[in-house]
Amino acid sequence: MTVLEVLQSTAAYFKKRGIENPRLNAEHLLANALGRTRMELYLEFERTLDETELAPLRDLVRRRGEGEPLQHLLGTVEFCGHVFLCDNRALVPRPETEQLVEIVESKIENRKSTILDVGTGSGVIALSLAQKFPEARIFAVDVSEDALALAGENAIRLGLTGHVQFRKGDLLENLDERFDLIVANLPYIATRDRHTLSREVLHDPGVALFAGPRGDELVGELIEQSRTRLRPGGMLVLEIGLGQSEALLSALAEKNYRDICSKNDYSGVTRFLFARYG
């Protein structure tokens, strides 16, 4: 089979299996199997592939057809212009979180700020901020040792070892520092909504997805705890789930935060909350 024929048959299979963007998935996997870029594939459409080239692709295609995330199969994900390692130790970063980082960057006035990323996962938020603000003191915390190991590998990959201090802990436990900014993309899915999730999402660790019966429990607890860890006038920035904004905005007001506001993601969903304390 030629490169083009393999792409066409793989895309057709993915479409039958209900995979979104089947042709794009096929291109990524074939490029990965051949050690090429997607653009290089277009220059080789008529080249015939031998069995040694097809063998590794078959396993990737099978796993993708069963719902394993493309990012896990490739082992990497692009986020905010950088390539991060990605596997089942942490949540696959979402486009909404790239928007969160862009918003946070626009709100940092002091390049030497002390910043905390809560629920860092693979480290994409903390490390993206470290790239942008090399003079900042950046901390990142997660309850999962596996996620922290992946974040550490990403720090090495990006040449940022030592630029982010990774800590193991549940929310703000084991942290004595005070921060100018706390940012968090915590689990915000209700356990009762598990059946609504795609096969791809269910490959992410449960600890990175589910927060409790309502879904906003962890964010609510962070709102409470952050009052003792923010410097006067410090900012809390949160990514939240669908339909959670009203209750969480009320929680911020009840806990005496000020300058409280929200922002929609690119899909028009209220996804981000901002507030200052003190």
Predicted regions and their residues:
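Conserved SAM/SAH cofactor-binding pocket of Class I
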Residues: 92-198, 221
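Non-catalytic accessory regions of SAM-dependent methyltransferases
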Residues: 1-36, 40-42, 46-49
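Conserved Class I SAM-dependent methyltransferase catalytic core
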Residues: 213-276
